[in-house]
Every structure is written in structure tokens, then in C-alpha cells.
Amino acid sequence: MPPFAERLQRGLEDENMHRALERFAPSWRQSRQALFEATAAEYGSDYSFVSLRQRLRAAKDEAIAHQQELVARFKEQATAAGAVVYEARSAEDANRYIYELCRRKGITLIVKSKTMVSEEIELNHYLEERGIKAVETDLGEWVAQLDHERPSHMVMPIIHKTRQQVGEVLSRATGREISRENVAEQVAVIRREHRQAFLTAGMGISGANALIAESGTVMLNTNEGNGRMVTSLPPVHVVLAGYDKLLPTFADAMTQIRLLARSATGQPMTSYTTFITGPDRPGKEVHIVLLDNGRSAMRADPRFKEALRCIRCAACANICPPYQQVGGHAFGYIYSGAIGLVVTPFHHGLEAAAGPQSLCVSCNACETVCPVEIPLPSLILDVRSRVVASEGLPWLKRLIFGVLARPRLFDLLTRLAAVGQWPATRGTPYVRYRYLRPFEGLPGLRPLAQLTRWRSLPAFARRPLRDRIGVRANLAATHQEGRRSDEMTVCYFAGCMTDRLYPEMGEAVIQVLERCGLRVVFPRAQHCCGLPALNSGDRQHGVAMAKQTVRMLERALDESGADYIVCASTSCVVTIIQDYLRLFEDLQLQSWLNRTRSLAGRIMDFTSFLLRVLVAQQRLPTLRRLRPGETAPVVTYHDSCQSCNCLGLRTEARQVIRDVLGLELREMRDSDVCCGFGGSTSIEHPEIAERLLERKLRHAEETGATLLVSDNPGCLMHLRGGVDANGRPLRVLHLAQLVAEYLA
């Protein structure tokens, strides 16, 4: 396989693929959602997506926990039905078994239906080196085979190709001119080419969507009839499947059927569902090869064993924004999509995952659609941590996170930067390309200048938030003397980005809280929550900052008697209430885990606090009237990934804009799709970030709105920078700033 950098560049340059994937993703999302909603409406909540995924997760967890018993049961039943079951420890073991079977039977031609496990073990290459021809009969797989490619998607192997490209491949392979436009003609050609192979092959190889332990049955779900021909026509049928395909019962398999096609392609079910229990006629042989190849190591890992639930639906690829920009050959190794980043280290080594995992923007969308609730985002971060532990961090990241973990040094350097940044900002709030362009030739400045070509970067504030509010006694208060019985106190955790880059956002938050009659405490010791380091796989500095934050918040609550901790950065909120828990549990730091759990119940994001506390308790003051000549803005809203995918916030901000403020809200297309920020990913892979940003801003402009609102400083930095760099007619605000503008 070509190196990652080469695969990535090819993916970035393939405009046909970008268009195909960007067309498919929204239509898939709509079809999938409509099907699950329709099923639940017709059959009840037991058939909703949430209920079905919980049932299938439970079945898969049972299979993982009791794998040995299920293997024994499956072997007993399959053998009784006339099949031969072989357990292969490794790729070499499985390949050798199949080759020796061919050699004993004198088989030189094999027909195959789609099986990702055969790709995993590189079976075709192994057999071809030994004089045995293996013909892929799945339409997409065969085109990929003819073009010397691997599948770029686990369900739709050539989703990256246009019909014109398919026509070219078929023309080269057949030596005849095949239509580039007529898909029916292309399919007819493939059908004719395969017929003789079906009739003369000595072996058919298939995968399995499930192995049902109670009966020794193989379940296959396909959309093409080739699967049934491969498994029925040749005298020898080999089923190649991992241990992870085991399910206890037929009922569990039915649950999987209800989830698989909807999750994979947005269709109610596959065209063909086939159950095979032993040979179907005298003289027919069925061999079932159960493959380990790293699965035992995965099962032994308390975190990664959850990945063994995967049913290979590829929903995680379908919804993934970076995948849509680079395709599966780059976003993965052999297995593509988010699950590919997770399982690759176990099947093909950590080095094979090192490049692809860097493409993940941590948007968490994959976890929301996974039909078996695999915590894919956190597992990808675990892979990233292992890559960093093995290969180390780039020197610049080591330097940045080393500074970030030292609050006093960070404070000093950011203040110096605020003074020394004038040549790059000219006194504006932005580091702009036109200011940096004259200095591109200086050492180290060209990469920075190129980053600002499409997105202006924020300038450091001359006066950070802590300086702007430090003179106000009620913000520095650390005692409860004179507190009224009905007075509510909140501890405001601003986050480093708001404090150092966007203090005006923090001032707006404080203004809203105080206008609602709250006493606001701003802990001077607050610093970075550690998110940048943790998202980069730097656990050493990330853990240090996590502990700093927990200590600081505990002390602030003790000294102020605050009722809540409010934060207007949903990324920071998710880091503290979700990521810290996983981190401390993983590191077996029980005391820190308990302390974080105590804090988590007191922390709320600004949007939720505004609605669930301030509005619910009728604390919000009267809104001001429009000034003479003032026109109310038309608003569109961007759902930050952490808000909608991690905290489940979907209607709350819209309620504030429409119902509380009374403003017109126009929904943009794909409002909950990542804007492309992704922390340091937007610096490491700017081409991807730029494309996602361009799409987001285009969708915002299509609404005709004049104001783009979100609730996360990271997204706002990205969106503001794109608007500034390209001169777009949009104003970009945090929701707190919008609310502050309309308070009387």
C-alpha cells in the first residue's frame, strides 16, 4: 500500500470523489433518520434507533464476554450440520489454510463475494503468488480489483468512482469500448464477464455478517445476487469471518438486520438476506474460518474490546466530515472510517494507523450514529496517545503544551505576544495574510502565513479577560458575607481561548449573568482545561492541566459557595465532565475520578444554564426595544460538535434566539456538521479544514442571514477567521454576546 502522505494527497486532489461523497452524505443522513423515525412511529419505541442499538449492543457485549462458550457452541452446531470449522490465529494461518484446501482439491479459480476480512489478511495477493486466481464478483469490488485498488468504503467499495471512471476501467479490462454513461450497460457487461467464472470456479469465498451460535448458522446480508451464487454454485464454500461476528441467537441477528442496512445505506434492509447452516447438498463442502488476527488482544483490552461490537455498517464513515474530503484510502488503512482508525493497530500495527488517525477532527458525529454505541471518538484519542507514546510529539507541540501546562509562563508569554504581534496584526483583532505576506521569506514564517491565507487568526488580547474584570469587586469576591437568601452565585470558568483571545465574549457572559441578578465569581487561578494537549494525544501535559483545573474549581466552590459553575465553551465543559472521567478511570486515578464526578454535577454550559435556570426561574430581565432605525438581524445558527454530539443540545440555542429574543432564525443546511476547526487538526491538515469551513460559510450565506451565531469559542475562531479572510458579509457572535445585546 502506498505511504499515507501519498494516499492523502491523492484523496485531496480527487474532485470527483469529493463531489460524490458530499452528495451521498446528506441524502444518507436524511434517509437513515426518516427510516428509523417511520419504524418507531409504526411499531413503537421498542423499534426506535435508541432501543434497537441498546439491544444489539447488549447482544454483542454478551458475545464478547462469553466468546469461548459461544465459539464452542457455534462449532458444535456447525459441525453437526456438516461444516468444518477452523480457528486461525493470524492472517498467515488463515491464508495458509485456504491455500492448502485449494491445493488438495486442485482448485485454481475462486469466486468471491464481498468480505472485508479477506482484504484484512490480503488473501487475493497470497493466492495469486501461488498460482490461484481469485475473482471478486461484487460489482464494486471487481472494479476496484481491475483498477488495482482497495475498497474505499466497507459497504460501497467504489463510492469514490464516477460512472465515467467505471466505464474506463471496464473498457481497459475487456478490450471493448464500454459506455461511460450507461450504468445498465456497465452492469450487463459485468454480469456476462462473471457468468463463466461462477460456473467453473472450484471454490466460493464469502464473509459473514453474523455467526449465530445457537444453530451454527452463517448470516449474509447483500444487495447483489452474487453472494448467493458464490455460496451455492461452487462445490467448496469457505466462510471467512472474525470472532467478532458471533451472536448468541437468531433474535439478536434479527436486531442486527433492523439496524444494518439503515445504518449502512439508508435503506430498510438489504436486497438479500441469506442463512447458511452447513452444506446444502451431498458432496458440497462448507469450511468456516474463524479469524483472530489481533482480536484476542482487543478483547483483552478493557477499552478497545468495545470495538469488537462493530457490524461493519460504515455509518461512521458516512457521517465523517474529513472522510468526505479525502476518502477511505487515506482515512484508514484497509478498514476505513472511524472504526478503521481504531482497529488498524490491532490488525496491521500502530504505524499503519499513525497517519490516518491524525485526520480525525474529534467532532464525535460517528458515535451518534454507531448502531452498537462504540465510543469511537475516545478510542481514536487512545490510539493517538499510543502513537505519541511510540513516536513522540512534534517539537513545536511539545513546546506549546509544555508552556500551556505552566500557567505563569503562559501568562507571561501571551502578554509579551500581545505586545509584539503588531507587525502581524497592525492593531486589528486578526493576524492577517496581507500583513504576513512581506515576511514569508523569513525562517518559520511561511507556514504561518499560508495558514492565514484562507483564515485569519485571532490576535492576543492586549488586556485578557482576567484584567478587564479584576477591578470589579463582585467578580473577585471569595466570601459569602452579606449574601441574600435568594441570591444565586455562579463560578465562571472562561477557558483559555476566551480569556486570552476573546475577552469580549467573557464580558458578555458576565453581563448576562449579572443582569439576571446573579453574583459572579471569576477564579483568578483558572487556566486551560487541557483539551489541546489531550486532543493531541499528549497525556502527560493533559493530565497535569486536568488536575490543575479540578483543584482550582474545588477551591473556587469552597471559597465562594457558588451554586453552579458556568462555562460558555462547550468544548471545555465536555472535557471536564466527560473526558476527565474517562481519563482518570483509564489511568486508575480513583481519587481524581471521584473528585471530578463531584464537580461534574455542578457544571453547566451557558446555553443550558440560560434556559434551564435563568429562564425557567424567570430571572431574565426585560429585553430592550429596537433603537430608531435599527433593524433586527436575521440569524442562522451553527451547532458546535461538542454541543450537539456530546451534550445533546439541539433545540436549546434555537429556543433562545426565537422564543426568548424574538429574532428570525433561518436554518442553514447541515447546521450540525463540523465547521472544520478540530483543534490542531486544522493546522496539521489545513486543506481539509479550509474545505469544511468554506462549505459551512457557504451554507450560512445561502440563508440570507446577516448574523452567524454559535456557542463555542473554537468554532467562532474558525468561522470569524474565514469571514475576515474572505471578506464575507457575515457578523459572527457567541450566543452570549447576542443575548447581551438585547438585554435592557
Model-derived regions, located:
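Residue-level signal for inorganic ion chemistry
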Residues: 94, 320, 603
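Long, charge-rich boundary regions
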Residues: 345-384, 402-416
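Residues immediately within or flanking Cys/His clusters that coordinate Zn2+
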Residues: 307-313, 317, 357-367, 526, ...
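The feature marks the mature, well-folded catalytic cores of soluble enzymes
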Residues: 1-303
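Iron-sulfur cluster-binding electron-transfer modules in prokaryotic oxidoreductases
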Residues: 97-104, 114-205, 209-222, 229-231, ...
